């Protein structure tokens, strides 16, 4: 079903990750600040809120390389909500340590220490919680089977100073061995903390999602195609990935050389053993999609071309020069996901940027998925450029000024040469404010949905 069946009229959205929401001790949270943000969107007639993956980040702060493709980032846990519901005491708030609010950058150590302190407080108060709450928690854990593996994985990582799982002692590398089962029992409290944090995050986000629905705001999430090698997903499901039991890569992901890189891009994530996914009826993938649609209304699928075919590189390669294109069973997978969702349509935005081959375009069109158009890519002087506003045909597109991968519009504009700036000004009557000019151009295209990153909208909201 095309985008205009999901979006009945020309609509506007803003791209902003929850970390940017004001009010939290270290970053934005799933609390009052998120609801206030939704109120602002509703007030200004903006109907879509898009964000990056809500998953935990890696050590560099990237949610695209997460230790779990199912879990939520503990940094988003809202303390005031926990106090209001009686899970921790208001007096505990004074002992949670420093905040990040007086810094000009995000301090991961402060965020992680805060999470640990909140986790200990939740554990201390858990025994005094009502039986009804404990029953609800246990039901949630049973419904979300991924949380057992995730909680265990994170506790083991912390035990070994955050080393990747392939550097752990041998008895910890393999899930479900006798030694590990015994160790898990000894670490039951630490594992319970991780589960409690995920449960509270899920409850808080569910409240945010319902609040957004009451204001007619739809949430657009983000799903990376690949998952991190150092993740609970890979550790607990090794047979689904091109990886040896000891953690060495059999094959890894990337893209071949192009105009921008003579050696290609080597991403280092394991590729999928699609034959195993087929034999298991795509169970892991279907659960992954199911989890995402618990959290969001629409999903941007990153590296959509991977569902048609992917560049496979040997696990020990140092560049992506030598590799092979391998077909993916994307059509079969998407049909199963579509059926799981009721069989009507797939609320997915296909990230189809870069060099897109006919098989990728065919897959997108077969499922009537909207693609993406980035205006910052449009103005290279080529009249056939597919990102030029006049070349955006039909309504089944989502137009962006830029995404998280782009520079801000101001930076993009300042880095254009004089001739490019002059040409754009002459043709598009650019004002002195390039950000607002690009927003106006985006709103004027045929596409049913236009989305701008937050920094372009700050002055107007």
Please name every model-derived segment:
Residues 3-10, 15-17, 23, 60-199, ...:
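Alpha-amylase-like alpha-glycosidases and glucanotransferases acting on alpha-linked glucans and related
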Residues 14-18, 25-29, 51:
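Active-site-adjacent substrate/metal-binding segments within catalytic domains
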Residues 33-55:
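Catalytic domains of carbohydrate-active enzymes, especially glycoside hydrolases
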Residues 42, 205-213, 338-342, 364-365:
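Surface-exposed amphipathic alpha-helices with a cationic face
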Residues 52, 218-220, 224, 298, ...:
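Outer-envelope exported proteins of Gram-negative bacteria
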Residues 194-227:
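Conserved, well-ordered alpha-helix/loop/beta-strand core segments that scaffold catalytic motifs
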Residues 459-461:
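Conserved small/polar residues in nucleotide/adenosyl-binding loops
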């Amino acid at each position: 079903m095309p985008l205009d069946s999901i979006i009945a009229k020309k609509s506007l959205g803003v791209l902003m990750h929850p970390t940017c929401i004001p009010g939290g001790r270290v970053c934005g949270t799933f609390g009052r600040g998120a609801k206030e943000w939704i109120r602002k969107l509703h007030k200004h007639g903006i109907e879509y809120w898009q964000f990056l993956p809500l998953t935990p980040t890696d050590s560099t702060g990237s949610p695209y390389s997460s230790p779990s493709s199912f879990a939520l980032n503990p940094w988003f846990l809202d303390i005031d909500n926990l106090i209001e519901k009686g899970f921790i005491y208001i007096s505990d708030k004074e002992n949670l340590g420093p905040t990040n609010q007086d810094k000009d950058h995000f301090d991961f150590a402060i965020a992680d220490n805060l999470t640990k302190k909140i986790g200990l407080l939740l554990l201390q108060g858990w025994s005094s919680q009502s039986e009804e709450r404990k029953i609800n928690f246990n039901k949630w854990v049973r419904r979300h089977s991924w949380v057992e593996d995730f909680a265990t994985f994170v506790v083991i990582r912390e035990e070994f100073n955050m080393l990747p799982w392939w550097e752990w002692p041998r008895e910890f590398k393999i899930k479900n061995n006798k030694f590990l089962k015994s160790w898990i029992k000894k670490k039951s409290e630490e594992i319970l903390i991780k589960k409690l944090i995920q449960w509270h995050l899920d409850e808080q986000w569910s409240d945010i999602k319902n609040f957004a629905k009451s204001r007619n705001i739809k949430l657009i999430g983000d799903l990376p195609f690949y998952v991190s090698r150092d993740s609970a997903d890979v550790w607990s499901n090794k047979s689904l990935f091109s990886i040896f039991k000891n953690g060495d890569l059999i094959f890894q992901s990337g893209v071949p050389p192009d105009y921008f890189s003579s050696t290609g891009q080597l991403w280092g994530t394991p590729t999928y053993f699609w034959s195993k996914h087929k034999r298991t009826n795509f169970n892991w993938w279907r659960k992954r999609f199911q989890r995402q649609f618990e959290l969001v209304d629409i999903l941007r699928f990153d590296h959509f071309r991977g569902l048609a075919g992917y560049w496979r590189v040997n696990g020990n390669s140092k560049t992506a020069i030598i590799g092979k294109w391998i077909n993916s069973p994307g059509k079969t997978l998407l049909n199963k996901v579509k059926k799981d969702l009721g069989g009507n349509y797939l609320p997915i935005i296909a990230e189809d940027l870069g060099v897109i081959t006919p098989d990728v375009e065919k897959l997108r069109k077969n499922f009537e998925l909207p693609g993406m158009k980035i205006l910052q890519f449009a103005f290279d002087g080529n009249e056939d450029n597919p990102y030029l506003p006049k070349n955006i045909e039909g309504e089944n597109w989502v137009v962006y000024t830029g995404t998280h991968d782009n520079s801000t519009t101001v930076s993009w504009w300042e880095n254009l040469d004089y001739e490019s700036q002059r040409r754009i000004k002459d043709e598009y009557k650019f004002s002195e404010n390039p950000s607002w000019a690009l927003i106006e151009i985006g709103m004027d295209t045929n596409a049913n949905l236009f989305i701008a990153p937050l920094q372009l909208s700050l002055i107007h909201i």
